[in-house]
Amino acid sequence: AASDVSKRQGWRSQLNPLLQTDLMVIHPPLLFLFYSLCIMVTLHALAAILSPEEDAQKLLRERATPVARVGFAVGTLGIGLGGLWAYTVLDWGGYWAWDPVETASLLPWLCLVLFLHLRITPGRLPSRWTVALGVLPGWFAVHATMVTRANGVWASVHAFVGDGTSSERSQSAIVRLMEL
């Protein structure tokens, strides 16, 4: 019975050879952890905004900043290993290609960089900017997840599924976004 299923699935029966690498075990889980940490930073920033009795800067300093530091480190490692994978295994001609998925993963990372820099140099900008910037990494992490999972909506070198012959899926970007 199992052989019948694999015969019917054709190209889907085996993992793409480009994905059969040790970096596949490391890179995607690191980015998933990175996105999760970005969402945690956003939740702490929202708690700081919505908490009437506590100082927002104190909440950010005690809760969001340590998570942002870990998220920055994990994101740097995840994005860096993705670049190494692209250069060595995938032979895409470089570490970075400005692919929609790569760019989407860079956005929450840049937000964390800005957030941490504003935390290091307090007083240069009003504190509300730091709090507002703390909200952005989670939103961009959700956006990056959507871009990564929306295979076919944005042309991407990260599209490892599909054989290009499926006629039942709409080619309209709006319809594909609604399918998400």
Task: List PLM regions with ranges.
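Internal, non-catalytic "lid/hinge" segments that mediate substrate recognition, gating
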Residues: 8-11
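Short aromatic-rich membrane-water interface segments that cap or initiate transmembrane helices
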Residues: 13-33, 93-107, 158-179
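Hydrophobic alpha-helical transmembrane segments of polytopic
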Residues: 34-37, 67-75, 104-111, 130-141, ...
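Short, small-residue-biased leader/transition segments that mark boundaries at the very start
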Residues: 1-6
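Alpha-helical transmembrane segments of multi-pass membrane proteins
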Residues: 78, 144-145
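Catalytic cores of phosphodiester-bond-cleaving enzymes
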Residues: 33, 46, 50, 74-77
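Juxtamembrane membrane-water interface segments of multi-pass membrane proteins
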Residues: 41-69, 81-97, 112-137, 147-163
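Core mixed alpha/beta domains of very large multi-subunit molecular machines
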Residues: 21, 29, 35-37, 41, ...
